[in-house]
């Protein structure tokens, strides 16, 4: 039998430096990654350092609402 809600949910990670600077002349968009997290182990918002192809460097990508 299944237990209540699923613990694993799909989330979207978005580049914080692209969002903070706005879409300036250098960048053509905002980097987003799709991944999963376990709601029981990490109830808070997830932040990971990932490569942003628009900034051309590794930046912090934070979880956003769908």
Curated annotation (Swiss-Prot):
<protein>
    <recommendedName>
        <fullName>Large ribosomal subunit protein bL33c</fullName>
    </recommendedName>
</protein>
<keyword id="KW-0150">Chloroplast</keyword>
<comment type="similarity">
    <text>Belongs to the bacterial ribosomal protein bL33 family.</text>
</comment>
<keyword id="KW-0689">Ribosomal protein</keyword>
<dbReference type="InterPro" id="IPR001705">
    <property type="entry name" value="Ribosomal_bL33"/>
</dbReference>
<dbReference type="GO" id="GO:0006412">
    <property type="term" value="P:translation"/>
</dbReference>
<keyword id="KW-0934">Plastid</keyword>
<dbReference type="Pfam" id="PF00471">
    <property type="entry name" value="Ribosomal_L33"/>
</dbReference>
<dbReference type="GO" id="GO:0003735">
    <property type="term" value="F:structural constituent of ribosome"/>
</dbReference>
<dbReference type="GO" id="GO:0009507">
    <property type="term" value="C:chloroplast"/>
</dbReference>
<dbReference type="GO" id="GO:1990904">
    <property type="term" value="C:ribonucleoprotein complex"/>
</dbReference>
<keyword id="KW-0687">Ribonucleoprotein</keyword>
<dbReference type="InterPro" id="IPR038584">
    <property type="entry name" value="Ribosomal_bL33_sf"/>
</dbReference>
<dbReference type="InterPro" id="IPR011332">
    <property type="entry name" value="Ribosomal_zn-bd"/>
</dbReference>
<dbReference type="InterPro" id="IPR018264">
    <property type="entry name" value="Ribosomal_bL33_CS"/>
</dbReference>
<dbReference type="GO" id="GO:0005840">
    <property type="term" value="C:ribosome"/>
</dbReference>
């Amino acid at each position: 039998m299944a237990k209540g809600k699923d613990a694993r949910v799909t989330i979207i990670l978005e580049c914080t430096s692209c969002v903070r600077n706005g879409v300036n002349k250098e960048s053509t968009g905002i980097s987003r990654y799709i991944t999963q997290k376990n709601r029981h182990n990490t109830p808070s918002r997830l932040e990971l350092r990932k490569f942003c192809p628009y900034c051309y460097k590794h930046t912090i990508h934070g979880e956003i609402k769908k």
